[in-house]
């Protein structure tokens, strides 16, 4: 009868669907994690004059990249060289916002692969270099990462020098003292004393 035929067709295709699912359920699409970085000219063309919207939209996408379509990717699997290029691109669109340096310093710096932290350090320093008197906080974050995570004391000291020299008058006093602390930790007590003496003379 027609009903039996339709039931047979339904069961037949249901079985085919189950077989197809069983054979393909372990196949995952190769979505990648960090997308390719466009050129600034491409960005300007596709932003249709609203670069700030592009900055916010793509910033949010980079914040969540790797955690889409049911995936949860560990930071050690991310291509930090691409992230670094994305961060630099965002700064070309808006270097006043603290959104991207915050994302870099407080989230992406937590990678399990400590060697990748150098990309975060370099970006934070370059970001702060554009406006040291207002962006000195990111020198401090870069210095902390260099000293405590990347374990490069000389790099940390070089950033601490930038922090000391660029901090404005209304910045906390410790921004100038950090260099002395790092020098003392390295056993360079005379240099540390010279820094502290200079600070005292400056505020005397």
Report residues per predicted region.
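Residue at a conserved register position within TPR or TPR-like alpha-solenoid repeats
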Residues: 107-111, 146-147, 183
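Boundary/linker segments of alpha-helical solenoid repeat arrays
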Residues: 98, 131-137, 165-176, 201-204
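N-terminal alpha-helical interaction modules that lie
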Residues: 1-93
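Membrane-embedded segments
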Residues: 78-138
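Long, ordered, amphipathic alpha-helical scaffolds
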Residues: 1-15, 181-204
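Structural register within alpha-helical repeat arrays
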Residues: 103-104, 142, 176-179, 183
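Soluble extracytoplasmic domains of inner/organellar membrane proteins
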Residues: 143, 150-157, 180
